Structures are given as structure tokens and as C-alpha cells.
Amino acid sequence: MSAPDALHLMRLRGRARAARCAALIVLAAAVPAAAGCGSSASTGSSTSAASTTASAATATTSKATTSKPATSIAGAEMGRLPKVPEPTRPTSLAASPTTGESAFLTAVFHDAEALWTREFEAAGLQYTPARLTIFHDQVHTACGTQSAAVGPFYCPADRGVYLDTRFFDQLGRTVGVRLGAFARAYVVAHEVAHHVQVLLGITGRVRAADHQDPAGTNARSVRLELQADCFAGVWKHATYERGQLTTADFEDALRAAAIVGDDFQQRRATGTITPEDWTHGSSAQRQHWLTTGFEQGAPGACDTFGA
């Protein structure tokens, strides 16, 4: 990376940190209920609609992970994945009126798949591609029949990423914030990250731990989701290195991460926050780990189980 590029990245990182607070403040002022995101839907459940304030999101950053899982859950394989290298071949992900929603989501999916394929090959591991399905209203999966209310999700049983194109506009409308292309891209990269977790054996180790220690299930679920956010940030690091990510783009992704935070959604639904019920993490947590992946550009920095 050249010196001017490195300086620009430092500026972008600093502005991204400031954007985390700005995104929370803007979203806290929104009144309508927000739809949830059904990530890693092994049972077809989705996060309930809700809201929060910026201060509440910050205050509850660490409460959901009071039961600290063993660091061995992350596994040695993740540490073998190298830092994302400088790109050798640019790929266009630009969204335009002629591109179409489905085409853009498909392009992001395949770009994320290509990144993880390279990462696995560099580590001497085999990457088995995920399956992409774009749906409307409802879809039949190995995890059961899911409605559009679930939002985008990953089904471990058939290793499929399922995306409802209307989810993104609906999510933005319900909180009064327009979500741009890279907010959508963040969600897609997050779901692909769940596939990466399955291939690395992380999801299997989490499920085994859940069986042995049911009381810690929610805490481990939060860490699994935050790791997927971090992996999504690693992908965003790669898009930045290709010159396809601007400050506004990353702020857009941070805004989306805030909306799908458990505290944000709980506050909107009930007016209260109960960290013990979280399954995905607070707005501040999700923004933190997305930023960590983006700044570090290395999967090894995403050990949320050892943090």
C-alpha cells in the first residue's frame, strides 16, 4: 500500500469510529418499529423488532457476554487464515439503477465467496461454496419454511444463504433512514461469514458447548454473531483495498449494524433492555466488531470467543 493510500485509510478509520456514535444518535431518534435480521437461522427464528438510544447501546456493550465461552471454540483453523492481501484483479460492485437489487446482491455474494476461497486456499484448507437463494414472501429450506419476516439468513443444514430483497428497503423505512448499497453488502457478507464459521468447525463447537451448557447458549450465540460481523468487516477491508469503499459507504454499514443490534430492537419493542436475552449483540458491539474486521483485514483478529 502506498503512503497516500495508508494515510487515507487512517483517516477513513478515524471517521468510521466517529460515525459509530453518529449512527446510533440518528437511529435513536427514529420512531417506527424495525424489522429483524434472521442470521444463522438453524431453527427459523428471527430477532424481534425494537429500538434504543445511543447511551443505552454504549452502556450495554459488554453485558451480553457475561458467560465467557472457552477460547478453544474459535479453533486453530481460523488463525491459519492470512491477512487479506492486496488485490490483483479489481472487481466491480457498483450498484446502479440498471444493476438491479438481485444482481447487486448476487455480485456481493460471489465476491465474498471468492475472498474466502482465496483465504482457505492460502491456509491449505478446502472451501466448499455456499448456495445463494434470493426470495420473496417465503422460501422452503432445510431449516424449515421461512417467511420474509425472518429477513436474510443462513441455513447450516443446507449451507444456503437466503436473501429477501425487500427486507433492506423495509428496514430502512421503518427507522426513517435510507440504507445504501454497502449496508446491503454488509448483511450479505455477514451471512456468508456464517458459512465460513460452519466450514471452520466453529458453529459445530458452539452447538456442542450449547448442549453441555444450555445456560450459556445466548452468550455463545452473541459471540458467534459478532464474529460474523468481524468476518464481514474483513471482506469490507478487501473492498477498500480495491478502491470501492468510501467513508460514506462504511458509515452506511455501521448504521445497518446499529439497527440490527439487540438493544436497539428490544428498546423499540418493549421500552426495556434485557441483555440476558440477546442472541446477536448490542448495536455498539456489532459496530465494534465490524470495525475491527475492517481495520485489521485479518480473520485471526475476529476471535470473539477469546475477547
Task: Tell where the protein language model's regions lie, with residue ranges.
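Active-site recognition of the HExxH zinc-binding catalytic motif
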Residues: 116, 186-199, 229, 233
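Catalytic Zn2+-binding segment of zinc metalloproteases
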Residues: 192-207, 240
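Catalytic zinc-binding patch centered on the HExxH motif and its immediate surroundings
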Residues: 137-164
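Short helix/loop segments within enzyme catalytic domains
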Residues: 106-109, 113, 118-121, 223, ...
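Short pre-active-site segment immediately N-terminal to the catalytic Zn-binding motif
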Residues: 169-186, 218-222
